[in-house]
Each structure stands twice: as C-alpha cells, then as structure tokens.
Amino acid sequence: LLIFATQAGWSSTRKSAAFDEQYHLAAGYSYLRTGDFRLATNHPPLAGLLAALPLLADSTITLPTDHSSWQNSDRFLFSDIFLWESGNAAQSMLLRARWMVTALGVLLVASIFFAARQMLGVRAGWLALLLTIFEPNLIAHSRFVTTDLPLTLFIFLATWWWWRWLVHARWRYAMLAGLFAGLAMGAKYNGALVWAILALTALLQPITPAGASWKQRLASMIVAALAAVAVIWTLFRFSVGPVTFLPAWLPLPAPHYVQWFWNTVVRIIDLQGARVDFFLGEASSRSWWNYFFVAAGVKLPLLELLLALIGFVLLVRDRSVRRLCVLWLPPALLLLLGATQVLNIGFRHMLPAIPFLLLLGASVAERVPWLTTRPRRTAIAAGLLALWLVLDVARVAPHYESYFNQLAGPWQNWSNLLVDSNLDWGQDLIELRQVMDANGIESVNLAYFGKAAPEAYGVRYQPLPSYLRFMEGREIYAYNPYTPMPGWYAISATALRTGTMTPETVDLYKVFRDLAPEARAGFSIYLYHLAYPPTTTVARPIVTGAALWTLPPAALGIAPDRRAAVKWLETSASTVYPQGAGFTATRDENFQPVAANFADVLTLLGYTNNMQSVKPGETLALTLYWQVGEQPMPQPAPTRGAALSIFVHVVDGDPARKLAEFDSWDAALRGLEPGDVIAQHVALEIAEDVAPKAYDLLAGVYSPQDWQRLVTAQDGATYDYVRIGAVEVTP
C-alpha cells in the first residue's frame, strides 16, 4: 500500500492541473462551503466534495461567490476564477485535494487484495496486490481530482459485496452493496451502470444452498435500490421537487440529481459528431466501435492482459465461468457499452473494469499447481513478475497517465494511436517550464490542450489556437499554419492531431507532424524549434478579419521558397506598414512626434491631427503611429481575450478627469515583427457640455486582461501614459 501511495504522491507533485480537475474541485469545495450544488451539473458533487475536505480548514481560500459566474451556475468560468484569478494558491490546493483521491486509491488496492483472497485464495490475493500496486492507470487516476477513481472504487465495492450476498445470503451484504452503488451514482452519472452489473451477476451466479434464492435476489435488488436512493438523497440534503421532463405535480427526491442525470444523457446524445476525436491516425467527428478494444490493448500492461486472458481460459476449462462471472462480466459489459460509440475520448472511461481484470489475472495463481506447489518456484515466479512490473512502469514514471505498453511502439508513436486523456490531459505544464529552463528557452508558442493557466506555472508563452482555453480572438485567428513564424513551439499531442477539435482546424499543426521534437514535456507536450533557410524569402501580406487557416497558402503569398509573416487586422480602422515600408506620415505637416517607448513593446512615434480645433458635440479624429519593439507583451494569468490595447484620453489637467476616451487595438501581435508600424485611427467624441478651452491628450498601452499599463520614461521619471499634445475646444 505504501509503495502505491508513494508512486501516486510523488508523481502528483510533478503534475499541473489536469483538464477536469478544476471543475470538480470548484464544485466540491463550493458545496462544502455553501451547501449549494449549483455547480454539480455535468457530474454529481461527491468526488469533488471528498477531494475538497482537506481544504476546509484553510481560512485563506477565497470562494468568489460574488462573481457573475456563480450566479449563472457557470462551472467552467467559475472554476477559472476560483483557481487562477482569486489569489488562491491553486497548485497547493490541488495537491492537498489529491491526497484524498490517493487515499481512495489505497482503499481500492486493499479492497482488491482482500476480495481476491476471499473469492479466489491466498496466493491470488498476493498476486492481485502485486499487479495492482504497479498498475499505471490506477496510479495515475489516484492522484487526479476527477470522478474516475472514486467511481472505480465504489463500483468495485458494490459488486464485491453483492457477490458476497449472492454466495452468503446475509441481508447486510445486500444493504452494503446498495450503499456503495449509491456512492458510485453520486460520484458520476454513469455510475448507474452498476445496476446492470448487479442485475446480470444475479442472473448468472449459480444458486447455492448458502446463497440467495431467486426470490431473495429479486427482493434484494429493491433493498439495494432503496439504500442507493437514500445515499443520493442524503448527498443532496434531502431536497424534494419537480423536474422539467416530468409533470410538475410529481415531486422527486434529489431533483437536482435527477434533472442533471437526464440533461447529461441528452447532452451526450446531442454531442455525437459535434467535435473531432482521434483514433489510429484518423481525426474524425464520427466514433469507432473498436476504440476501447484497441485502447485496452495498448493502455493496459501486457502482463495484466496476458494473465487476464489465461485466467479466463482457465475459468472456461474448469467450468467456473458462471460461478466466477463477477470477474469477467463487468469488463465485458463496459467494453460492450464502449462499442456503442457514445464517448471515444479516453481509456479512463474503462477504469472500473481494471480491478476485475486484475482479479481475473490473479486467479491464475490458484489454477497453475506446478508453479505454486514448490516454494522455490513460487519465489522465482513472484520475483520475475515483480521485476517485469517495476521495469515496465518505470519506463513512464512519473507520467503514469501517459502509459502505453510495448505493443504501441516507442513514445514517438503514441500520439499516432490515441490522444486526449489517454496521453495528454493538460498535466505537464510543470514539466514544460522545467524543460524550457533546462534548454534556455525564454518563451514558446503554446498549443495547450487543457484548462490550467500556463502562466500560473511560470510558463512564458504566446497562445496558439487550442481547445478549450484558446478558441477565438485576434491572436488565435492570426496563426499562420502553413509557415509559422520562426521560434520555439510547444504543441500538445492532442492539438497536434486534432487542432481545436473542429473539422476545419484538424490540420492546424500539420507542419509539425513531420518534424522530430527537439524535446518533450512528459509525454504530452512536444517542443519544436522552427527555423527557415537563410535563402527563404518573406512575404508580408495584410489580412483583415479572416482566420488565416481558412485561406489557401497562395492567398498569403506562400511559395516553395517563400514564407509569410502575416499582419492580421480585426477591422479596417488600422493599417500596417511591414518593416516600416511605405510609412511616410513623418513628412506630413500635421505630424506631431512623440517618441514614447512603452517597455520596448511599442513605441508611439507620433500622431497626425488634421483638425486645428473641435467644437462640443463634434468628433476629434486622430491617427496614432506605433512601432513594434523587441519585447513581447506581458501575459497575465490566465490569458483570456485580447492581449493588448491602447487608450487615448482627453483630460482636464488631472488624468482622472476624462472628458473623452478611446480604447481599442486592431492588430494581432502574432505576425508582427520589430520595426513594423501600425497606424491606428482614433475617434474621440466631445460631449455637448464640454466647456471651451484647451485640454490635454494622453495616450498609453495596457492589458485588457488585468488592466496593467506599460510604463514609459519621461524627464527622468516613469509614467503609465504620455502627454502627446493638446486639443482646443472652441465655442
């Protein structure tokens, strides 16, 4: 048990927030703090609730219930605000929450050991323990704040106690089976599958003198169901009310659970074909019936597969298929459910099958007498098995979630087979930062498959189109997939194969598929250094509005020996002069020089003003000229929306006394190069009641995400704006 917990605990410190962790932690913690289950939508709150227990004693944690996302029950945005934007120590919170999941994992290991001893024998118990403590899928999910491990534990416990009831008809066993079935349903909506397992086991398990009769089996299903309902009702604070898909006069216990169970089923059906998934080299919006069969073949350790197969063959040979149906029925049922092609996004959905496969494999220890009758042979066999398991899992440690067996080939081939949570779940930002530091990489262009904030882990980056965090915005639309700008790129395996999981973006990163990574972060993020031969010429087209991946390469001026550094504009209110070519405003008699350098990100060269004065009610029209500097725009955490904007204010002396203001920026930073000049047209509406006199014009640069302004040096001091001139308001 200590070996298992150590592997999970040690590797947990090396992992950033995986894709779903922030959702479950936010929902569970908010439930504990407020008793409100409004965030328990896509999943019931039990898993997150258990994980959040270690956080209750921490009075420094801020729960932002005053944010609009809480009022709107928006778990996606609220979890972002909670973890990354409320001043909370996100990684520390996650590590403490993961302790509880690891504790559940240890309980699962112990349960498998004792179940094997009870069902099969002492030798089987020890073999099951050996197989379990080095099972990479169980180790991986025993240190993520998600629903998969709790669901696996509770389904296993429910099935085990149900088997005990069928073999030794004691009503408390049926009651316990029902309680654990209720916990499985409280952990995840598909926990309802446990009832199919229990019902089929009751039908197949032979009746014995000491076991439950047919009549008792039927009655016990009702008892177990009532126990499960009691668990769910307790979890939802004994609430009673109507649901939308039934008559309003019919109240139900735990209506929130029932309603969202129904909504989730409808949503899964509606989402079929709505996003692109990946399987065996094919990115498609269709599903594959054999997805989980292949996934099991490459994601489970070969020894585990081999022993499970031998175990099943021996069950058939010994005519024990019905007597020990509990060993093979749950995996078979889960695989058949997977063949319905409902959800092809990760082998983790088969995690509840693994404990039963381990029992099936462990049964071999009781059925091969020549191996177990002599202590010396037993010791040698155990030693060889242990060595095999240790060496196998050591190949990927501490990256257990990315485990593939030897059938999958070297790690470079794994993303050709499966991606998403099979390999890449957003968990390797810590590794990415360390790889960047080790290789002296200052910043990367990042295509990240995950919901964590890369900035929170010290990753310096510019966002590329990615599911789900970076799906839109000018920086995303400005990505040139045909000849990306030179520099370092960090591409998640899922993004490499599926883009942003929409049909039109599947090949966003096709150019990188034929390149060998310079380095990797874990097994999920690949680093490439992109450079072009010195003889390559550069086209510098200007594109307004259209996402670059929707345009053919020829439209961007790309040819075999010519790449494109595209200047992307959101509207026609701005103009770009690539490398300053064609910029002649300084020769205009109305040009007013400024030369204010904002942190070497942008320099305000000056502006033109063709209006000598303006009257109240009129619009003052200016054109500002900015030149791109050597430094990138600082990125706050998390990156959401525009990275940069500029302001122009008309003020009456004090900068806080604004009479008119302009805040906007049209150009994407991606594709801009040092020396590019951007001409931005500015319109300032002067109100009717403005008194005639001279007013100051101020300009500056800021981040719309955290409202931080860049500073500029003036007369030996630094300011977050520059006075560019004055405007005369006349009667």
Regions found by a protein language model. Name each.
Residues 1, 225-230, 313-332, 359, ...:
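Signature aromatic-anchored transmembrane alpha helix within multi-pass, membrane-resident enzymes
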Residues 128-133, 160, 181, 185:
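Short helix- or helix-capping micro-motifs
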Residues 129, 166-182, 214, 330-331:
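Short hydrophobic alpha-helices at membrane interfaces in multi-pass membrane enzymes
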Residues 37-100, 243-285:
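Interfacial juxtamembrane loops and adjacent helix segments
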Residues 405-731:
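C-terminal luminal/periplasmic domains and tails of membrane-associated envelope-modifying transferases
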Residues 295, 300-321, 477:
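Hydrophobic, aromatic-rich transmembrane alpha-helices
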Residues 179, 307-310, 319-339, 383, ...:
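Transmembrane alpha-helix segments characteristic
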Residues 117-119, 158-174:
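Membrane-interface transmembrane helices that cradle and orient dolichyl/undecaprenyl
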